[in-house]
Amino acid sequence: MTTPEDIIRRDVLAMTGYPVPDATGFVKLDAMENPYSLPAPLAAELGERLAHVALNRYPAPRPAALIDRLRAVTGVPAACDVLLGNGSDEIISMLAMACAKPGAKVLAPVPGFVMYELSAKFAQLEFVGVPLRADLTLDIDAMLAALAEHRPALVYLAYPNNPTGTLYPDEDVERIIAAAAASLVVIDEAYQPFAQRSWLPRAAQFDNVVVMRTMSKLGLAGIRLGYLVGLPAWLVQFDKVRPPYNVNVLTQAAAEFLLERVDVLDAQAAQLRDARTALAHAIGALPGATVFPSAGNFLLVRVPDAAAVFDVLLTERVLIKNVSKMHPLLANCVRVTVGSPEENARLLAALKLALP
């Protein structure tokens, strides 16, 4: 009898699935989501729009109205094209699949977004992680040396980085782009609404750069929409490995509707930026807590015992992310999402119990 072990790749058999904990009944501060719902009148209007979507028809593979709205809202350069994905995770997988030549490598600073490494492994690419400095800033000399040694196919730069919140200096990014002449540099701007800095306006200035974004952190995590901006020479190739109906009709309709009213989402992002400052100050005042600078909608905090803090918060029904085992540089670190005022108050009350 044939078994999975007879058919499935050995490296896949050795993997574990990406863990997503059940957050029912918890204050959910583990996944960098926008805590705010849409205003009731806007939600009702969205419901009316979605009620008229033709669910019996396949989605348009390249929905022109949505792409045009993305161009207008984000300022996509005229020379660039836009490729849509079912979240940026799918785009990362598409890039790995398209670039998976024998011996090809993917390079990124670490600790960083885990999907860069996972997608490389899925496509049987070698992943090269370049450690940050001890203070979690970019080690530009190590990056340049790694680029020269490995000549990777793909270089990922999260701008800002997750889970550290670090926003790499523009001059360092420019040096990496220049040194990566044999590579494609993917600048991941998932947290751009909170960083308020972007390489997207300059995407057409480099022949080896694409910029990736997602609607998730802006407040639309549930609809799963990511997009890639870059010169057509690149995007036409990546489009070949895109599943033909990858972005569903409800996502397309919801995204187009909300991009027409993006001021609501922008106002929520502004609230979270202000809350981030206040929350960082409050956590930093707790005994034994060190808060790292963050340009995202989350904070990385070093505590005396990350596992103990996580467990106390779990008891208090507050769910955060214990990242201490992700990388040695993250020893005794936890990551907390910036939530609503009520959620942040619950978080602080629980942290005071965990850090007496």
UniProtKB/Swiss-Prot annotation:
GO function terms (MF aspect): histidinol-phosphate transaminase activity; pyridoxal phosphate binding
Task: Tell me which species this is from.
Answer: Burkholderia mallei (strain ATCC 23344)
According to its UniProt record, which protein family does this protein belong to? Belongs to the class-II pyridoxal-phosphate-dependent aminotransferase family. Histidinol-phosphate aminotransferase subfamily.
Cofactors (names): pyridoxal 5'-phosphate
Give residue numbers for the modification (N6-(pyridoxal phosphate)lysine).
K217
Lineage per the UniProt record:
Bacteria, Pseudomonadati, Pseudomonadota, Betaproteobacteria, Burkholderiales
Q: Which PANTHER family match?
A: HISTIDINOL-PHOSPHATE AMINOTRANSFERASE (PTHR43643:SF6), HISTIDINOL-PHOSPHATE AMINOTRANSFERASE 2 (PTHR43643)
Task: Return the EC number.
Answer: 2.6.1.9
Q: Does the keyword Amino-acid biosynthesis apply?
A: yes
This protein's name: Histidinol-phosphate aminotransferase 1
Q: Which domain of life is it from?
A: Bacteria
What pathway is it annotated to? Amino-acid biosynthesis; L-histidine biosynthesis; L-histidine from 5-phospho-alpha-D-ribose 1-diphosphate: step 7/9
